[in-house]
UniProtKB/Swiss-Prot annotation:
GO molecular function: toxin activity
Tissues expressing this chain: Expressed by the venom gland.
Stored Pfam families: Toxin_7
Keywords: Disulfide bond, Knottin, Neurotoxin, Secreted, Toxin
This protein's name: U2-agatoxin-Ao1s
Its biological purpose: Insect active toxin causing rapid but reversible paralysis in crickets. No activity shown in mammals. Does not show effect on mammalian voltage-gated calcium channels.
One GO CC term, this protein: extracellular region
Length: 44
């Protein structure tokens, strides 16, 4: 659990545009995580 929380605070995973978040689908914009919209698979 400590590893997951650390990665969540860090932001984007290396070599991956998606964030390591278990709460739901998210994508990265730079080094920050943004939630995906419900109706589309694009970042808000």
């Amino acid at each position: 659990k400590k590893v997951y929380s650390f990665l969540k605070l860090k932001g984007c995973l290396p070599r991956n545009r998606f964030c390591n978040a278990l709460s739901g689908p998210r994508c990265c914009s730079g080094l920050r995580c943004k939630e995906l919209s419900i109706w589309a698979s694009k970042c808000l």
